[in-house]
Amino acid sequence: VGLDHRVAVFARGEQSLREALGACSILSRAAEQQAAILACPGTRWCSRALVETNALADRIRRELGTRLPAGAMVSVSGCPNGCAHSAVADFGLSGVATARDGQRIEAFHLLTGGGRGRTAALAQPAESKLTADEVLRAIAARL
């Protein structure tokens, strides 16, 4: 589970990636298929973003990463443009600015059931205007 967009691995020999990573104890599980957690740059770097994205993506990784199915995709986009591909994720999050009790809060719309490749499908709206804590509970309830 990582927060980066892409990782390229180059090698000289024909030793398998699993063997090479297994030799380094800290990387021993790196070759196993895991869930992908993607986040757009969010408000820190994007003028279109409505919410900060990386903190939530990191919380999802820390709190739910081991429970997410291998190959699943969780996508955190800071606005409806969906730069992190929320519309095709198993769990897609789209940032929205809203208010509760008269106070502006950062919130997310939760989309579920998206797919890529042979299982291509658009994710469907599941819940709206969730805080980060509510997002974690909503995803955990669906695992």
Q: Each PLM stretch: what is its role?
A:
Residues 87-143:
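Mobile "lid/hinge" segments at catalytic clefts and subdomain interfaces of large enzymes
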